A protein has these predicted regions:
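Intrinsically disordered, low-complexity, mixed-charge
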Residues: 1-91
């Protein structure tokens, strides 16, 4: 199990990014969370199988249909063994 923090920049708010991230996490069997940040970026943490996390990161880099992702930042985090679901924060 791996956990990654992802920050997506560009036109990533008000385009369904958090909703799509939640759908992708559910489809891939990942736990974690996603939220909008005051600086206009979207921050996420996801954990699960390495291949599923990589697929999630790829989808985040592409963004949903109306997003324009200009930069993505990824860093490792310590897995949370007690986390059981994925949450959209600030919805």
């Amino acid at each position: 199990m791996v956990r990654k923090r992802i920050v997506a920049a560009g036109l990533v708010q008000c385009v369904g990014f958090r909703w799509v991230a939640g759908q992708n996490a559910a489809r891939l069997g990942l736990t974690g969370w996603v939220c909008n940040r005051e600086d206009g970026t979207v921050e996420m943490e996801v954990q699960g199988a390495a291949e599923a996390v990589d697929a999630f990161i790829g989808a985040a880099a592409r963004g949903p249909r109306y997003a324009e992702v200009t930069h993505i930042e990824v860093e490792g985090r310590k897995p949370d063994p007690d986390e059981r679901s994925f949450h959209v924060r600030g919805a």
